[in-house]
Protein backbone atom coordinates (compact mmCIF):
# COMPACT_ATOMS: atom_id res chain seq x y z
CA UNK A 1 0.00 0.00 0.00
CA UNK A 2 0.94 3.63 -0.42
CA UNK A 3 1.96 5.57 2.70
CA UNK A 4 3.07 9.11 3.53
CA UNK A 5 6.80 9.69 4.16
CA UNK A 6 8.79 12.30 6.09
CA UNK A 7 8.64 14.77 3.17
CA UNK A 8 5.13 15.64 4.42
CA UNK A 9 6.29 16.65 7.91
CA UNK A 10 5.81 20.40 8.43
CA UNK A 11 4.18 20.75 4.96
CA UNK A 12 0.84 18.90 4.90
CA UNK A 13 -0.26 20.21 1.48
CA UNK A 14 -3.36 17.95 1.36
CA UNK A 15 -3.76 17.84 -2.44
CA UNK A 16 -3.77 14.05 -2.07
CA UNK A 17 -6.85 14.08 0.17
CA UNK A 18 -9.21 15.35 -2.53
CA UNK A 19 -8.37 12.61 -5.04
CA UNK A 20 -8.50 9.63 -2.68
CA UNK A 21 -11.52 7.49 -3.62
CA UNK A 22 -11.62 5.68 -0.26
CA UNK A 23 -10.90 8.53 2.21
CA UNK A 24 -7.98 6.72 3.83
CA UNK A 25 -6.03 9.83 4.93
CA UNK A 26 -5.75 10.77 8.60
CA UNK A 27 -4.59 14.13 9.90
CA UNK A 28 -1.95 14.95 12.47
CA UNK A 29 -0.87 18.39 13.61
CA UNK A 30 1.97 18.66 11.05
CA UNK A 31 1.69 15.44 9.01
CA UNK A 32 -0.83 13.25 7.18
CA UNK A 33 -0.90 9.46 7.11
CA UNK A 34 -2.59 6.85 4.95
CA UNK A 35 -4.26 3.95 6.71
CA UNK A 36 -2.59 1.03 4.90
CA UNK A 37 -5.52 -1.24 5.77
CA UNK A 38 -7.91 1.09 3.91
CA UNK A 39 -5.67 2.06 0.96
CA UNK A 40 -6.62 0.25 -2.26
CA UNK A 41 -3.26 0.94 -3.96
CA UNK A 42 -4.84 2.92 -6.80
CA UNK A 43 -1.95 5.41 -6.77
CA UNK A 44 -3.98 8.51 -7.67
CA UNK A 45 -2.62 10.36 -4.63
CA UNK A 46 1.04 9.89 -5.54
CA UNK A 47 1.36 12.43 -8.40
CA UNK A 48 -0.78 14.99 -6.53
CA UNK A 49 1.71 15.53 -3.70
CA UNK A 50 3.87 18.66 -4.22
CA UNK A 51 6.33 17.39 -1.59
CA UNK A 52 6.64 13.94 -3.23
CA UNK A 53 5.85 12.41 0.16
CA UNK A 54 3.75 9.42 -0.90
CA UNK A 55 5.57 6.13 -1.38
CA UNK A 56 5.67 2.50 -0.41
CA UNK A 57 7.79 3.17 2.72
CA UNK A 58 6.91 4.31 6.24
CA UNK A 59 4.26 1.63 6.59
CA UNK A 60 4.38 1.22 10.38
CA UNK A 61 4.26 4.96 11.12
CA UNK A 62 1.23 5.34 8.87
CA UNK A 63 -0.51 2.36 10.45
CA UNK A 64 0.11 3.65 13.99
CA UNK A 65 -1.20 7.17 13.42
CA UNK A 66 -4.12 6.13 11.21
CA UNK A 67 -5.45 4.40 14.32
CA UNK A 68 -4.93 7.51 16.50
CA UNK A 69 -5.64 10.55 14.32
CA UNK A 70 -8.96 11.82 12.89
CA UNK A 71 -9.94 10.99 9.32
CA UNK A 72 -9.53 13.78 6.75
CA UNK A 73 -11.63 13.76 3.57
CA UNK A 74 -11.39 17.33 2.26
CA UNK A 75 -8.39 19.48 1.40
CA UNK A 76 -7.55 22.22 3.86
CA UNK A 77 -4.72 24.76 3.93
CA UNK A 78 -1.09 23.67 4.02
CA UNK A 79 0.93 24.68 7.06
CA UNK A 80 1.96 28.35 6.95
CA UNK A 81 5.66 27.60 6.46
CA UNK A 82 5.21 24.55 4.21
CA UNK A 83 7.24 25.99 1.34
CA UNK A 84 10.20 26.60 3.68
CA UNK A 85 10.16 22.95 4.78
CA UNK A 86 9.25 21.28 1.48
CA UNK A 87 12.70 20.12 0.35
CA UNK A 88 14.46 19.78 3.71
CA UNK A 89 15.78 16.27 4.48
CA UNK A 90 15.76 14.40 7.78
CA UNK A 91 12.52 15.74 9.24
CA UNK A 92 11.60 12.57 11.13
CA UNK A 93 12.58 14.09 14.48
CA UNK A 94 10.11 16.94 13.88
CA UNK A 95 7.07 14.69 13.50
CA UNK A 96 4.41 15.75 15.99
CA UNK A 97 2.32 12.92 17.43
CA UNK A 98 -0.52 15.36 18.20
CA UNK A 99 -3.67 14.88 16.12
CA UNK A 100 -4.90 17.39 13.57
CA UNK A 101 -8.49 18.61 13.29
CA UNK A 102 -9.68 16.08 10.71
CA UNK A 103 -12.73 16.74 8.57
CA UNK A 104 -15.70 18.00 10.53
CA UNK A 105 -19.04 17.18 8.90
CA UNK A 106 -21.99 19.49 9.57
Swiss-Prot record:
Its cofactor is [4Fe-4S] cluster; [3Fe-4S] cluster. Keywords: 3Fe-4S, 4Fe-4S, Electron transport, Iron, Iron-sulfur, Metal-binding, Repeat, Transport. Binds 1 [4Fe-4S] cluster. Residues 80-106 are annotated as: Disordered. [3Fe-4S] cluster binds at residues 8, 16, 49. [4Fe-4S] cluster binds at residues 20, 39, 42, 45. Residues 2-29, 30-59 form the 4Fe-4S ferredoxin-type domain. InterPro entries: 4Fe4S_Fe-S-bd, 4Fe4S_Fe_S_CS, 7Fe_ferredoxin, Fd_C, RnfB_subfamily. One of its GO terms (molecular function) is 3 iron, 4 sulfur cluster binding. It holds the Pfam family DUF3470. It comes from the Bacteria. Ferredoxins are iron-sulfur proteins that transfer electrons in a wide variety of metabolic reactions. This is Ferredoxin-2. It comes from Rhodospirillum rubrum. The lineage of its organism: Bacteria, Pseudomonadati, Pseudomonadota, Alphaproteobacteria, Rhodospirillales.
Amino acid sequence: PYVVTENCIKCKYQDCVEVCPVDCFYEGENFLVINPDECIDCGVCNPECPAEAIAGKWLEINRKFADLWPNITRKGPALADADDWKDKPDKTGLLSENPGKGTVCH
